[in-house]
A protein has these predicted regions:
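Ser/Thr/Asn(+Pro)-rich, low-complexity disordered segments
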Residues: 1-171
């Protein structure tokens, strides 16, 4: 793919997330800068089972920050990529995602509020915690990482102790 085509696709994506509505309303695509995903989308109807997934949002933000580093040319479009990626990252409210707990929740639903599950064990939430702890605007407290790390599961095999991270999202 030519660089110019990649820049266009990236800008379309970043502009969409930056300009789309944030909030608990049915047409929102995010809340506190965490993206809303859907298990079922039906044309001309409200999405079914919409929820903000904290780790999926972390993947999106990590990708945005990555392309912001890669696309470093001094052009208006590539400057906009860097600006939008930084703005999206700064908008994410990691403290809100804790819902007053020690660790980060899995997400939030417009109809019912925060999901009851929290990130536990060594899993993909490592990226979520790195982004949250490093946030220049709404950082997670250092204690949240210690709380998450305290849920790691350690195993022994052939006399060696290791950090377990099995299939199924760290189960």
């Amino acid at each position: 793919m030519p660089r110019s085509a990649a820049v266009k696709r990236i800008l379309d994506t970043l502009r969409f997330f930056w300009n789309s509505p944030q909030g608990p309303e049915p047409d929102a695509t995010g809340y506190h800068a965490f993206i809303i995903i859907f298990s079922t989308c039906r044309p001309a109807a409200a999405p079914v089972n919409a929820n903000c997934q904290t780790v999926d949002s972390a993947f999106l933000l990590a990708g945005a920050l990555t392309v912001a580093i890669y696309f470093d040319a001094e052009t208006a479009d590539e400057h906009e990529i860097r600006t939008l990626a930084d703005a999206l990252y700064r908008r994410a409210d990691w403290q809100w995602a804790q819902n007053q707990g020690a660790t980060v929740t899995h997400g939030w639903k417009p109809e019912s509020g925060f999901l009851k599950y929290r990130w536990e064990g060594y899993d993909e939430a490592l990226l979520l915690y790195m982004l949250g702890l490093g946030s220049p605007t709404h950082p997670l407290p250092e204690s949240s990482y210690a709380a998450w790390a305290s849920t790691y599961r350690w195993e022994q095999c052939y006399g060696y102790e290791y950090l377990y991270a099995g299939p199924g999202c760290g189960d």
